[in-house]
Amino acid sequence: MGAAASRRRALRSEAMSSVAAKVRAARAFGEYLSQSHPENRNGADHLLADAYSGHDGSPEMQPAPQNKRRLSLVSNGRYEGSISDEAVSGKPAIEGPQPHVYTISREPALLPGSEAEAIELAVVKGRRQRERHPHHHSQPLRASPGSSREDISRPCQSWAGSRQGSKECPGCAQLVPGPSSRAFGLEQPPLPEAPGRHKKLERMYSVDGVSDDVPIRTWFPKENLFSFQTATTTMQAISVFRGYAERKRRKRENDSASVIQRNFRKHLRMVGSRRVKAQTFAERRERSFSRSWSDPTPMKADTSHDSRDSSDLQSSHCTLDEACEDLDWDTEKGLEAMACNTEGFLPPKVMLISSKVPKAEYIPTIIRRDDPSIIPILYDHEHATFEDILEEIEKKLNIYHKGAKIWKMLIFCQGGPGHLYLLKNKVATFAKVEKEEDMIHFWKRLSRLMSKVNPEPNVIHIMGCYILGNPNGEKLFQNLRTLMTPYKVTFESPLELSAQGKQMIETYFDFRLYRLWKSRQHSKLLDFDDVL
């Protein structure tokens, strides 16, 4: 759109410059002819009309139909000068050059239909025909014998009644109102050339006469000039597009930056975990030579005490602790043995069920009904703590049999390979059971609730997830066994479809009801109460 407008502007500017050049050349040559040959006083007008008519044939000067431009050029100054010369000399009007009026028009109303875009050159003959026809609009005028005898029968009254009227054709304005003597002013002295009229003759472009519904414009097309409204609209569109492009570019940059930051954080997590496994914080600090200025100066350990004395104190303290533990162990073992010697005693089996398991509320209803030693404990995954779980286990054991301890235990919770999801924000992994104090305390207290009189190692089964699907699962079990020493505890997490898994399920559940519960565990179509 911009390229087409600029191309049109270039064509119009070239056309106007060529018109101006031709007009100047014709006027200069006409002046030369009028000076060298006085009988051709109107030579400039001939050449000026020829320049316009010759130029109008060029395709780039054909205006758009809606412009309806008209260029009127009247040689009234030279016409009046020739008439005054004839009046003073007293010679007949037929002798000497005949006055002419040249009119170049683009008005469609003044031209034939087939030549709506052509230029009409009207040659009005001299005084004799005007005296013969005083009202020249009553009969059409004929061209001079030397001309092409073109019919110029359109009345000058219609020219004078056009939109521009006598402003552009003052010669016609003189011819319209009265007879020939008053129209040509033969008795009057020669009128001096009006400066405004001469100026209009010298101009190469005049005011346009256009239709009433279109505002009057000059020879310069309005769209070639600077239009503030169009420019403002274009600037607004450009600014809107620039803002849209800027927002898209900023969004792309933010997305790429977030991806880079996310990948870098992931890289730091991976590298940091390996570094923690490789060396402790103290070792890293000792080996680090680039300390911050705010770090305290590392001080050597106080060696004033003899190392031999400190080692003796540590060994004696350990000996006292072991003696106390042995005494407690023997006391607790005797009490448990006394409780188990009663008739009909069955070693308790504790089921610890997390509420996070789907349809966990139905699990207590599918346990083995022929085994009263199974103690189901359903805890709240979201709000319970390790202390709450331990207190509930102790309370249920005392209710079952005072002084009884756990022989077998089932932990039914969510998790995955290498980790147990015991509580909200409490995930048991092989690293966390070594570092987090509350988790270490939980497993140590749980070990004290395990049986001491069981000739076989106590068993803790894990259901709801497959811990051993990852090598970290075996590390987790190993760390838990280390935490629960001196009690003999083993951890098992077999697949439910295996033989060991079937044996584990039959230890705690009615196998038929368990399969039914498992098939309806993730279903919302049928309520499990109806099945039971």
Swiss-Prot record:
- Residues spanned by motif Nuclear localization signal: 249-252
The membrane topology term of the UniProt record is: Peripheral membrane protein
Q: Lipid moiety-binding region for N-myristoyl glycine?
A: G2
What turns on this gene?
Answer: Up-regulated by gonadotropin releasing hormone (GnRH).
> Biased composition, Basic and acidic residues: where in the chain?
38-48, 302-311
Which key words tag this protein in UniProt? Cell membrane, Cell projection, Cytoplasm, Cytoskeleton, Lipoprotein, Membrane, Myristate, Nucleus, Phosphoprotein, Synapse, Synaptosome
InterPro entries according to UniProt = NSMF
What's a single GO CC term here? nuclear membrane
Q: Which domain of life is it from?
A: Eukaryota
- Chief place where the protein resides: nucleus
- Which Gene3D superfamilies does this UniProt record tie to the protein? iswi atpase
Q: Describe its PTM?
A: Proteolytically processed after NMDA receptor activation. Cleaved in a calcium-dependent and calpain-sensitive manner. Calpain cleavage is essential for the translocation process from dendrites to the nucleus.
Q: Polar residues composition bias: which ranges?
A: 155-164
Query: Which residue intervals make up region (Necessary and sufficient to elicit dendritic processes and synaptic contacts)?
Result: 2-235
Q: Which biological process terms from the Gene Ontology are attached to this UniProt entry?
A: cellular response to amino acid stimulus; cellular response to electrical stimulus; cellular response to gonadotropin stimulus; positive regulation of neuron migration; regulation of dendrite morphogenesis; regulation of neuron apoptotic process; regulation of neuronal synaptic plasticity
- Compositional bias (Basic residues) at which positions? 127-139
**Region of interest (Disordered), residue spans:** 34-67, 127-174, 275-315
Q: Which GO terms describe its molecular function?
A: calcium-dependent protein binding
Q: Where in the cell is it found?
A: Nucleus; Nucleus envelope; Nucleus membrane; Nucleus matrix
Q: In which tissues is it expressed?
A: Preferentially expressed in immature migratory, in comparison to postmigrating, gonadotropin-releasing hormone (GnRH) neuronal cell lines (at protein level). Expressed in adult brain and liver. In the brain, expressed in the primary pituitary gland, cortex, hippocampus, olfactory bulb and thalamus.
Carrying Phosphoserine, the residues are S206, S292, S294
Record text on subunit structure and interactions: Interacts with KPNA1; the interaction occurs in a calcium-independent manner after synaptic NMDA receptor stimulation and is required for nuclear import of NSMF but is competed by CABP1. Interacts (via the central NLS-containing motif region) with CABP1 (via EF-hands 1 and 2); the interaction occurs in a calcium-dependent manner after synaptic NMDA receptor stimulation and prevents the nuclear import of NSMF. Cannot be competed by calmodulin.
**Function comment:** Couples NMDA-sensitive glutamate receptor signaling to the nucleus and triggers long-lasting changes in the cytoarchitecture of dendrites and spine synapse processes. Part of the cAMP response element-binding protein (CREB) shut-off signaling pathway. Stimulates outgrowth of olfactory axons and migration of gonadotropin-releasing hormone (GnRH) and luteinizing-hormone-releasing hormone (LHRH) neuronal cells.
Stated family: Belongs to the NSMF family.
More details: Transport from dendrites to the nucleus is induced by NMDA receptor activation and results in a rapid stripping of synaptic contacts and a reduction of dendritic complexity. KIF5C associates to its 3'-UTR mRNA in granules along dendritic shafts, suggesting that this protein may regulate its dendritic trafficking and local translation at postsynaptic sites.
* Name by which UniProt lists this protein: NMDA receptor synaptonuclear signaling and neuronal migration factor
